[in-house]
Regions:
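Secreted/extracellular ectodomain signature
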Residues: 24-233
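Bacterial N-terminal signal peptides
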Residues: 9-19
């Protein structure tokens, strides 16, 4: 005879417990993102998701700034390491000329280069275990699955823009279909042991069935639409 009453009491107790648990869950603070206020260099952990269409230099710079802000380094002026080619009367822009003078350090405080000359020499410390993301993470390279080592730069080994004509910037970072972008290798490795394969900023042009600039195209050759960000000030 007491079974319905017992069942009701148990149900009420369970409901009360669920309410308390829900309230406690709502009071839990959001996980704190890792902070690196002294960071002045990183590789984006992900791209905006539209292949090599970064919204031009302005969009890429804003993306760098947003990622840095999330991890405590937003007080600096961030620039994407990207060149653009001369077109429609607009002059070319060199990645070399837009990222400040250095020195630059990664999430962990490791110096990646002391100056522009150092950065564009064999003395720089860039590589898979040093070129970390804004979260302090390593980007997988050759030998890992997936391989994401291609980094968009549109630049020569000296950090300069390519001459007008053959596209090397996916239409100055506005195309996610036709075109091609020069990429570097974050891990300094490739299919061959040559200077291009070991280059952090000028290894090979992107390519693929969609035209060369889509997210799928970039992934097909070992990329993911990632790019370097430097604090210019």
């Amino acid at each position: 005879m007491n079974k319905p009453k017992t069942t009701l009491v148990a149900a009420l107790a369970l409901a009360s417990l669920c309410v308390v648990s829900s309230a406690e869950a709502q009071q839990q603070p959001a996980p704190q993102l890792p902070q690196a206020p002294n960071m002045t260099f990183f590789v984006t952990s992900a791209g905006p998701g539209k292949g090599a269409d970064l919204g031009g230099l302005e969009g890429a710079d804003q993306y760098c700034q947003q990622l840095a802000q999330r991890h405590g380094a937003g007080g600096k002026t961030w620039r994407a390491y990207l060149s653009t080619q001369a077109v429609d009367g607009k002059p070319a822009v060199n990645a070399h000329d837009r990222i400040g003078k250095g020195p630059w350090q990664n999430f962990k405080g490791d110096i990646v280069a002391q100056s522009l000359d150092d950065l564009h020499s064999d003395n720089n410390k860039l590589g898979m275990n040093v070129s970390l993301t804004e979260r302090g993470q390593v980007i997988p390279g050759v030998g890992f699955a997936p391989n994401r080592h291609d980094v968009l730069t549109g630049s020569t080994p000296e950090g300069k823009a390519f001459p007008a004509g053959e596209d090397r910037t996916c239409r100055n970072w506005t195309s996610s279909t036709q075109g091609s972008a020069m990429v570097g290798h974050i891990d300094r490795k490739g299919l061959r042991d040559d200077a291009a394969s070991r280059s952090w900023n000028s290894s090979h042009p992107s390519r693929g069935p969609d035209g060369g600039c889509s997210q799928a195209d970039l992934r097909s050759t070992g990329g993911d639409g990632l790019f370097y960000c430097f604090a210019a000030q």
